[in-house]
Amino acid sequence: MSANPLDQFKISTIFKLPSIGGYNIDFTNASLFMVLSTLIISLFCYIGLRKENILPNSMQLIIEAIYNFIVSTIESNVGRKGLQYIPLVFTIFTFIATCNLLGVLPLGFTVTSHIAVTFAISMVVFISVTAIGFKHQGIHFLRILLPKGTPGWLAPMMVFIELFAYCARPVSLSIRLAANMIAGHTIIKVIAGFVIKMNIFLTPLPMAFIIILIGFEIFVAILQAYIFTVLTCVYLSDAINEH
């Protein structure tokens, strides 16, 4: 067990691949866990939905619960116009939640602790929302940069501020997710290190505390996926609904 609690976030190469344009594209532990997350989601959906049973199986019930949750989240934040984007929101939620939960497992790796990963997901949301905004509102989508009732003399400054805030969305989304994942796993690692070094008679209480922390980390893993999903829906609302 490494003494440094941050070692768990290190990227390690599993096998090398030829570079492309001078860029390293080796298959790493991060690559492995992202592939695993994708496979788990795909297999889960395939096995759960391959048969239409009168009495749904446990997997189907879970998938339907997630689907209903996504529908409810979209309807409450975007409205019924946003239901056409269920696949986008469903994919984002399940991918982030699965990546987060895999990181809680022993020998797991938390890919969402890396800004490169969370920023890539955030950019998918940012580009998609921007494209959806122009699709639904055309050039009028740019009105998001100038709040109604803004005095003419203040308009240039407000446009600059709103443009900066809009472009900062993927940055804030990615940092929020990565920071929470790093913080939670680091705390667990530090406390686990104390437990190993303590006398055996003093271990039950710290061990119980670790179990509670792991349970809390599972809750945080799902919560962060939920927060990311809700913020995605809020941005979709800006893109679809005229303000």
From Swiss-Prot:
GO terms for cellular component: plasma membrane; proton-transporting ATP synthase complex. Keywords: ATP synthesis, Cell inner membrane, Cell membrane, CF(0), Hydrogen ion transport, Ion transport, Membrane, Transmembrane, Transmembrane helix, Transport. It is a multi-pass membrane protein. GO terms for molecular function: proton-transporting ATP synthase activity, rotational mechanism. InterPro entries: ATP_synth_F0_asu, ATP_synth_F0_asu_AS, ATP_synth_F0_asu_bact/mt, F0_ATP_A_sf. Key component of the proton channel; it plays a direct role in the translocation of protons across the membrane. F-type ATPases have 2 components, CF(1) - the catalytic core - and CF(0) - the membrane proton channel. CF(1) has five subunits: alpha(3), beta(3), gamma(1), delta(1), epsilon(1). CF(0) has three main subunits: a(1), b(2) and c(9-12). The alpha and beta chains form an alternating ring which encloses part of the gamma chain. CF(1) is attached to CF(0) by a central stalk formed by the gamma and epsilon chains, while a peripheral stalk is formed by the delta and b chains. Coiled coil: none annotated. It is found in: Cell inner membrane. The keyword DNA repair does not apply. The keyword Hydrolase does not apply. This is ATP synthase subunit a. It comes from the Bacteria. HAMAP family: ATP_synth_a_bact. The chain crosses the membrane at residues 29-49, 54-74, 89-109, 114-134, 144-164, 182-202, 208-228. Belongs to the ATPase A chain family. Gene3D superfamilies: ATP synthase, F0 complex, subunit A (1.20.120.220). It comes from Ehrlichia chaffeensis (strain ATCC CRL-10679 / Arkansas).
